[in-house]
A protein has these predicted regions:
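Nucleotide-state-sensitive switch-loop elements of NTP-binding domains
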Residues: 2-3, 16-39, 47, 52, ...
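C-terminal lobe/tail of nucleotide-utilizing enzymes
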Residues: 1-5, 9-33, 222, 226-242, ...
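P-loop (Walker A) phosphate-binding loop of NTP-binding proteins
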Residues: 44
Length: 441
């Protein structure tokens, strides 16, 4: 299956010797390529898209590029990590960026962006009438698809200004990642569609003839709407439509233009996911959709991947050792399932586990008098077993994705112990993005 992978960014490497190992996503090569003008981070909600976008922007800036990051509803801590108390619809320069580049950040204000469209396409009197209209205020503040449409609109505005050589976009959180591609077209079609044209007709006919047309042609619909939303709704809608008459044709045109911009060679999509079934299922859908729309997919960023410094000790052996300790038994080094000796406190003649088995020699010799060394050790072994089981589940989930999409380049980002709260944390994420290894390697 095609993935829409662009060839101009040079982000893919050759497949490894094992066919199950996907190509590695060369993040720095992508960021350094002057032909890369837009990076879109997309995927399901709650997988670290916003942090990934900010980390990519910082890394690109510190490698010499002039970057703006367009975020959608970021956590306050993330804004503060960039040294900004609050983000708004205006790009703000981030202080403390090393290297020769610049980093600017902004947060989409969908209502303000909609207001800007009105103000730029209508004269002062008409713009004021539109902005004060109750139906417009509801539409601009939360109509289905408005946030996605305005994200596309703002992206088009930033690209047209040409003040930055790289724009990193964090797509809106939504029930489905596909909404980012679908919702702008839906809203544009609504605003340019038959429903609006029907509402325009009475205003264009005018006077009693217009009201007669409205009463005959729309009585059922308006009756239902009035029951649901109040008798004043129709008047607000008609006033809105009359004021917006000269603007409606542009909504779908601008949405289509931005959609074509997303298909252009200078754009790169990064699908962001976590090693969880739902997130990777959504990522797989998005990969397929990008291929169908012929959009340039750079690869998959797999966040919050867990590992272990004692991976040579399997979950099964750790559990077996824990059970023996809890039962008060002594594990035989030659025949025991766990392959671990008894704790040093009870076996001074060499019962300590060798370091190669993941337990340091003499680990128990400094235990406080009266401490339940066996119980503590058994608990730690069970925690290790749970971690190894989690790692195995994540690996199986990754393997399912890579078996379906073996040509999609992958980088993995190890899970962090806490939240990112400063530029140093974003740098760490950027370093892990650039140094990540393919799943299964």
């Amino acid at each position: 299956m095609g993935t829409g992978m662009g060839t101009g960014t040079g982000v893919r490497t050759e497949m490894g010797a094992g066919m199950d190992t996907p190509p590695e996503l060369a993040v720095d090569r992508l960021l350094d390529d002057p032909g890369t003008r837009i990076i879109v981070c997309c995927g399901a909600g709650g997988v670290g898209k916003t942090t990934t976008a900010a980390a990519l922007g910082l890394r690109a800036a510190e490698r010499g590029r002039k970057v703006v990051v367009l975020t959608i509803d970021p956590a306050r801590r993330l804004a503060q990590s960039m040294g900004i108390d609050s983000l708004d619809n205006t790009p703000r320069k981030v202080a403390g960026v090393a290297g020769g580049g610049e980093l600017h950040a902004m947060m989409l204000d969908m209502k303000r962006t909609f207001d800007e469209i009105v103000e730029s396409h209508a004269d002062g009197e008409r713009a004021a009438a539109i902005l004060a209209n109750p139906f417009y205020q509801s539409l601009s503040a939360g109509f289905a698809g408005t946030q996605e449409y305005m994200a596309m609109e703002k992206l088009g505005q930033l690209r047209a200004r040409d003040d930055w050589d790289l724009i990193v976009v964090d797509t809106p959180p939504s029930r489905s990642a596909l909404d980012f591609l679908d919702a702008p077209k839906r809203l544009g079609s609504f605003l340019d569609g038959k429903f609006i044209r029907v509402l325009m007709a009475p205003a264009k006919v005018g006077g009693r003839a217009g009201m007669k047309f409205l009463n005959v042609g729309m009585s059922l619909m308006t009756g239902t709407l009035n029951k649901l939303m109040g008798a004043s709704l129709l008047g607000d809608v008609q006033t809105f439509v009359a004021a917006m008459d000269t603007m409606f044709g542009g909504f779908r045109t601008r949405a289509d233009a931005t959609f074509r911009l997303l298909q252009a060679p200078g754009t790169a999509f990064l699908v962001v996911a976590a090693p969880e079934p739902d997130a990777l299922r959504e990522a797989a859908y998005f990969v397929e959709r990008l291929g169908a729309e012929r959009m340039p997919l750079a690869g998959l960023v797999l966040n919050r991947v867990h590992g272990s410094g004692a991976a040579q000790l399997s979950a099964e052996r750790a559990l077996a050792a824990a059970e023996n300790l809890e039962e008060g038994g002594i594990v035989d080094q030659e025949a025991g399932k766990a392959g671990l000796g008894a704790p040093a406190a009870h076996s001074p003649a060499g019962g300590s586990a060798p370091e190669s088995e993941g337990v340091e020699a003499g680990a128990y010799t400094d235990a406080p008098e009266g401490a339940d060394v066996e119980g503590i050790t058994a608990g730690l072994l069970r925690l290790h077993a749970e971690r190894m089981q989690l790692i195995a589940r994540e690996q199986r989930t990754r393997d399912r994705f890579t078996s379906l999409h073996p040509d999609v380049a992958v980088t993995e980002v190890a899970a962090l112990p806490g939240d990112v709260h400063d530029l140093a944390g974003l740098r760490t994420i950027g370093e892990r993005l650039a140094a990540g290894v393919p799943a299964g390697a």
